[in-house]
């Protein structure tokens, strides 16, 4: 199938969702050669990935992931397996790759939102092109990444937050590692991670590195069963809602997807230059995260509050972003968000 798919994609013909599922099954089962994988994902990138193609690839990756069971259900290809009355599960995983050298905003947000009573299954990885991925900063904060799936499940159930370390849960991705590394360009695999949460997160705030991906990935999430959420991109390239200017937002609701622009001023927040939002290496970013969770003021706190506000709206904990920002600020200042970090560190290290 992959040889036929390469020939079609080279001619700029789109694949159906079913065809993409067949191709990705071949890739992730080890049935495609490295040359075929590299050719296919390069041709797909040059053509431009469609909503159906991304959806099909995400379904296969979800189906082959090691599941993290939260409650009684896990998100997979078959939507009938899902208990729609279960507790909301949030993921704040983004694509990364923004090149803006920002600190770990979505990881900081995860602790705040979980302290507000939302179950958070934070999916993430080590840095690929940046200085510090979510796994890197969590490790620097003292979180033990080398834990079994049952420890992650217990973490989410008992304290309301767990970290889903992508390499440990997506073993089938090993077949694409070599081709991806050797061609050295962004491909469909750079956007699949946030679409394939092994705990079946049904609520997401997903930051993307390109504006043209905002509405597209929102449509994909909708097809995959996301009940509510936001896909976002800052005008400065940040894969977050930024403080430097406008951000593009695609809102996912029961009625569909709505695209619009927002600015910090809409929520009473002062703009900040990108330099004030910069991070560093894992140890430096760990200091930033602790400072924010300890109540330190400044631009870094404001951008975390803004993004947390959207996450709290997505999960139904706030009726609008302004209320979400207020709730996030109160949660930090009460010490509850820092307590979540301390509890995650303790639980994951007790498991050793």
Curated annotation (Swiss-Prot):
The keyword Plastid does not apply. It catalyses: N-(5-phospho-beta-D-ribosyl)anthranilate + diphosphate = 5-phospho-alpha-D-ribose 1-diphosphate + anthranilate. GO terms for biological process: L-tryptophan biosynthetic process. 5-phospho-alpha-D-ribose 1-diphosphate binds at residues 94, 97-98, 102, 104-107, 122-130, 134. NCBIfam families: trpD (TIGR01245). One of its GO terms (molecular function) is anthranilate phosphoribosyltransferase activity. GO terms for cellular component: cytosol. This is Anthranilate phosphoribosyltransferase. The gene is trpD. The keyword Lipid metabolism does not apply.
